[in-house]
Amino acid sequence: MIIKVDSANIQRYHQLCKAEHVFGSRSRSALAAYGTDHDVHKFWILTEDGKDTAALHLNGQVLTVVKSGEIGTDDIVALTKEFEIHEIDSDWDLCEHLHTILGGVTESSYYMEYKGGNICPDFPDIQPADLKDVYSVLQQSHEYYRTHLKFEPWADNLEKLSACGAAKVYQLERDGKPIGTGSIISQDDTHAAIAAVAVIPEYRLKGIGTYITKFLIKEILSMGKTPCLISGYDEVAQLYRKIDFLSYGRWGELYI
């Protein structure tokens, strides 16, 4: 059974989001930013045999499923068809299983969490971002952003997440221009997620991405929280391991 999140059961949703901190904090932060009655962002609790088993967050045609154990998939499949969902983000095992039912294409890499110590250096050249500058950096940095990112909805979402205290966006300038960016994109009570660390091509292979990531780690630790992230590719996970991130499972994305 799928139950709509409202003021009476919102704490149950928060509890389910604790099962995994990257997608969980994303869903919880979206709920804080948009509330329970938004036209585009929808939030549900999946229950089975009277027990809450998963937190669901639908953003347009992207469904995030946060769970801690095995769950049934009938309600998720029905929801996917009802809302014409094109992407499901969750643990790898669920995405792999849904792939056998719904078809499509899957991607996967690691959930990662910071296990290192405090970061000592200061970062005087990293500042709160101008979103137009950040958008330009992202567009230059990777084909994914050129294909999927549209400025107005992207900026509007970040402004809402920032307004409720969930997100912080930063940029790095060198030679009088913005050349890198990174974000704290979502938070829960104990963790904050790093995302969209990017550097324009001519400044790559100089340790700048690592430099930005260390700044974000320091910011999150100063909040009394643990940094976490998802590595986009297994090769990228190797870079994060060099700065004391450890993997704790695999995320999956199913594109239908």
Give the predicted meaning of each segment.
Residues 1-27, 110, 116-151, 173:
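Short amphipathic alpha-helix that is part of the acyltransferase structural core
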Residues 17-21, 27-80, 180-195:
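Conserved donor-binding loop and adjoining core beta-sheet/short helix segment
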Residues 43-48, 169-173, 228:
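Cytosolic beta-strand hydrophobic patch enriched in CBS
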Residues 58-60, 149-198:
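A conserved beta-strand-loop-helix scaffold within acyl/acetyltransferase catalytic domains
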Residues 59-123, 254-256:
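Acyl-donor-binding surface of acyltransferase catalytic domains
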Residues 71-79, 199, 205-222, 242:
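Conserved acetyl-CoA-binding loop-helix of GNAT-fold acetyltransferases
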Residues 82-92, 220-232:
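Conserved GNAT acetyl-CoA-binding A-motif
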Residues 93-106, 210, 233-250:
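Conserved active-site alpha-helix within GNAT-family acetyltransferase domains
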